[in-house]
């Protein structure tokens, strides 16, 4: 999508081999409502999940504001039909890895149509253990060697599932925790982007959005390292499809659940030319990347300007 600071060769290749959507929108500018919309095809007002799960409820609101936040459902109802349940009923093997954030235990991926769950729990970020590095402290993801990187682990789990189900239809949903806070990158990647930042002469520049600062330049080395690690993980999964000869018969979709974090929690990225970011209903909060590759069905290198949304 044109960044000159972040490096994403796997995603760039995916765009060249499929369609790049320029007007794709999340159902909500925060995570849980959009994730529920992806799983169900329903808008947030239909699922009742209208804020991120864990957000303050009206009775717990402590800020002096004119309005209270609206109440919301804190889990995806089990009687709501999910994409995983539909595909499982159609004979697909179903697999989930990464961030779930759609309810407490009993409402996790294995309760919503997924045969296997690697890392999907109630948390919105990797807040247990050493977070983005093993030991993870995640009850649905066994610890790897000390220092193992979470995006790489989730990609390898996904690749292993694909290989073991190569001879039957499968639905593999890899929902990275990246690039959610906490901001943590591999040291080699952080150093790479610190050097790139210096070489390009980039410095932090700021604007204002209401009462908050907003970052105007992409130059945050840790965030850039997180983006590249995610891209490397995407490449791992795509390479597995190629190794197994499954590229031609596999639909690949890459998207996100809200805009980049530009106005809080470290202000790590910029969404310019779009206004604001995650948490805001401006373009910066809801316009998303969307890449679709389906050989023989989707024209390689095509660009789609038609507006689409996550329930689609």
Walk through the language-model features, giving the residues of each:
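Active-site-proximal cap/lid insertion segments
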Residues: 1-6, 22, 26, 43, ...
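Short phosphate-binding/catalytic loops that engage adenosine nucleotides
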Residues: 19, 91-92, 246
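N-terminal FAD cofactor-binding segment of flavoenzymes
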Residues: 33
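His/Cys-centered metal/cofactor-coordination and adjacent catalytic loops
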Residues: 45-83, 137-138
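Short, well-structured beta-strand/strand-turn elements
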Residues: 90-103
């Amino acid at each position: 999508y044109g960044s000159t600071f972040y490096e994403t060769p796997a995603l760039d290749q995916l765009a060249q081999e499929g369609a790049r959507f320029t007007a794709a929108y999340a159902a909500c500018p925060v995570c849980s409502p959009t994730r529920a919309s992806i799983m169900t095809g329903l808008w947030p007002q239909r699922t009742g999940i209208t804020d991120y799960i864990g957000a303050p409820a009206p009775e717990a609101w402590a800020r002096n504001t004119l309005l209270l936040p609206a109440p919301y459902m804190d889990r995806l109802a089990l009687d709501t039909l999910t994409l995983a349940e539909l595909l499982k009923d159609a004979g697909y093997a179903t697999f989930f890895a990464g961030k779930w954030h759609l309810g407490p235990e009993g409402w996790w991926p294995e309760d919503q149509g997924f045969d296997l769950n690697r890392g999907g729990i109630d948390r919105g970020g990797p807040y247990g253990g050493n977070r983005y590095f093993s030991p993870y402290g995640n009850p649905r993801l066994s610890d790897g060697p000390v220092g193992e990187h979470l995006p790489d682990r989730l990609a390898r789990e996904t690749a292993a599932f694909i290989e073991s189900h190569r001879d039957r239809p499968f639905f593999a949903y890899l929902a990275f925790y990246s690039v959610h806070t906490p901001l943590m990158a591999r040291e080699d990647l952080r150093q790479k982007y610190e050097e790139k930042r210096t070489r390009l002469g980039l410095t932090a520049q700021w604007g204002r959005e209401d009462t908050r600062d907003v970052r105007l330049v992409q130059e945050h080395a840790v965030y850039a390292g997180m983006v590249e690690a995610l891209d490397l993980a995407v490449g791992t999964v795509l390479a597995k499809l190629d190794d197994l000869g499954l590229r031609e018969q596999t639909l690949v979709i890459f998207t996100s659940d809200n805009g980049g974090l530009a106005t809080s929690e470290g202000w790590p990225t910029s969404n310019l030319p779009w206004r604001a970011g995650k948490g805001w209903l401006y373009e910066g909060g809801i316009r998303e990347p969307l890449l679709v590759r389906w050989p023989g069905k989707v024209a390689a290198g095509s660009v789609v300007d038609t507006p689409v949304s996550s329930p689609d």
